[in-house]
A protein has these predicted regions:
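Serine-hydrolase-like catalytic core of hydrolytic proteins
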Residues: 29-170
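Surface-exposed, low-complexity/disordered Ser/Thr/Gly/Pro/Asn-rich loops and linkers
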Residues: 1-33
Length: 170
């Protein structure tokens, strides 16, 4: 049995696999109709007790989530487990944090680069700029929701973790 795998027996490629009246099924998956370039949205989850509290103090800590998906798929509600999702994190914080999740452009729309793009004065890595825009928005506006802009933690999973590294080094 093992000998067959080691020898590399030739395959008879002379037999037809499809006939002229047959066709292969389309291998391209149908696009999700919700997919759009218009994706710069934030979810801001504020516990009721934080939202109702007077906005006189420094506010509560803020946790910003950047999802993973290989920079090609995903969205702001993409969590690998309930414990890393907003409900689990808010529960473990005794409802004393604000959770922010942001979307960003993916695939070629978000991470296109190369000499042709550079020669045409295009902007590479727009997905990272989308993330930066979201983080800047949080810095400017989170106090309106009871958050402390000086206590913002950014976390991510997989490509989201890589994005955090890129945001720190840019």
């Amino acid at each position: 049995m093992v000998g067959n795998f080691l020898k590399g027996n030739p395959v008879n490629a002379s037999l037809p696999s499809t006939h002229s009246n047959q066709y292969a099924q389309d291998q391209v998956n149908a696009l999700d109709p919700r997919i759009t370039e218009d994706c710069l949205f934030l979810d801001i989850l504020v516990p009721q007790q934080v939202f109702d509290a007077p906005k006189t103090g420094s506010g509560v800590p803020v946790l910003v989530w950047i999802y993973g998906g290989g920079y090609t798929e995903g969205e702001k509600t993409y969590y690998s487990s309930p414990s890393t999702g907003p409900a689990g994190l808010l529960r473990r914080s005794n409802n004393n944090i604000i959770f922010v999740a942001l979307n960003y452009r993916l695939g070629a729309f978000g991470f296109l680069s190369g000499p042709t793009l550079a020669a045409s004065n295009g902007t590479a890595n727009l997905g990272l700029l989308d993330q930066r825009f979201g983080l800047e928005w949080v810095q400017k506006n989170i106090h309106l929701f009871g958050g402390d802009a000086k206590r913002v933690t950014v976390m991510g999973e997989s490509a989201g973790g890589g994005s955090v590294m890129h945001q720190v080094t840019v």
